[in-house]
């Protein structure tokens, strides 16, 4: 089980920023943005540092793979747990990362919900009509380009239930690319499947690990066919990378 020291450190790290942002968001969006930026730039790396110190939990970010990235790009990735969000914030800490996600994340999740709203991530209502969802993504994409942010989308649409890469759905990705015209970085992450629930998080945290890597960068797709081809190839690339990581122990990079 998670140690008292680890839990105490995490709680002491989270509470001031979480409470501060809850209080700030309704009265001052600028202050909430400042707190949210602190959460992303300072607390996300500190979160993994605490886990490594007290639970021997490793964060393996393959930074050499980022050398192929252009200045501006879109990320498509597999999706394993809610921790995927701080994982990408930590991995791309030199960038301004913005996620396409369900709007449930923007409510009642300490540290996360106000941050996602203040930073204007793309929060899509679960019951949104397809056309409305596309409008959300289109506006989000244009805003990301204008502010030189990196949009991140999980084409599976939901977290994996078995650790395997699920079907990649194309509609959201196509709209995002139509509104941004950015190169596409295919990224793989692994380690979240064993931490996808609160119970499994506490049970599997010790000597676990998270891995994230850029696999390939595509030129901006110009058609529906090119978008579909990227998604098909990306799914295979990611699954192959997960298979390659599978034999490694948590302390092996």
Q: Each predicted region: which residue ranges?
A:
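Membrane-interfacial terminal anchoring regions of lipid-handling membrane enzymes
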Residues: 1-42, 65-69, 143, 192, ...
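N-terminal signal-anchor transmembrane helix
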Residues: 25-78, 87-90
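Catalytic core of membrane glycerolipid acyltransferases/transacylases, capturing the structured
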Residues: 25-26, 30, 69-128
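Residue-level preference for the first positions of well-ordered beta-strands
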Residues: 72-74, 148-154, 183
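A conditional alpha-helix N-cap/helix-loop micro-motif detector
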Residues: 81, 130-134, 166
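A cross-family acyltransferase "interaction/gating" segment
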Residues: 111-113, 150, 161-225
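Soluble extracytoplasmic domains of inner/organellar membrane proteins
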Residues: 138-142, 150-151, 156-164
């Amino acid at each position: 089980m998670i140690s008292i020291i680890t839990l105490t450190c995490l709680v002491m790290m989270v509470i001031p920023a979480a409470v501060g942002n809850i209080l700030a968001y309704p009265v001052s969006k600028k202050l909430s943005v400042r707190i949210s930026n602190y959460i992303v730039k300072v607390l996300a790396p500190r979160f993994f540092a605490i886990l490594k110190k007290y639970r021997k939990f490793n964060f393996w970010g393959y930074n050499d793979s980022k050398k192929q990235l252009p200045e501006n790009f879109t990320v498509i990735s597999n999706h394993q747990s809610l921790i995927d969000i701080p994982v990408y914030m930590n991995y791309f800490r030199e960038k301004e990362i913005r996620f396409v996600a369900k709007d449930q994340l923007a409510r009642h999740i300490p540290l996360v919900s106000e941050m996602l709203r203040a930073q204007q991530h793309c929060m899509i209502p679960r019951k949104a009509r397809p056309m409305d969802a596309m409008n959300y993504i289109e506006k989000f994409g244009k805003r990301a380009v204008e502010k030189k942010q990196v949009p991140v989308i999980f084409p599976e649409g939901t977290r994996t239930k078995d650790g395997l890469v699920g079907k990649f759905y194309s509609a959201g990705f196509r709209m995002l690319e139509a509104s941004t015209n950015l190169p596409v970085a295919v990224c793989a992450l692994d380690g979240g499947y064993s931490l996808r629930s609160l119970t499994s998080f506490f049970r599997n945290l010790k000597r676990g690990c998270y891995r994230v890597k850029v696999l390939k960068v595509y030129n901006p797709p110009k058609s529906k066919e090119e978008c579909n081809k990227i998604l098909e190839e990306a799914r295979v690339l990611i699954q192959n990378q997960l298979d390659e990581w599978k034999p490694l122990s948590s302390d092996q990079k």
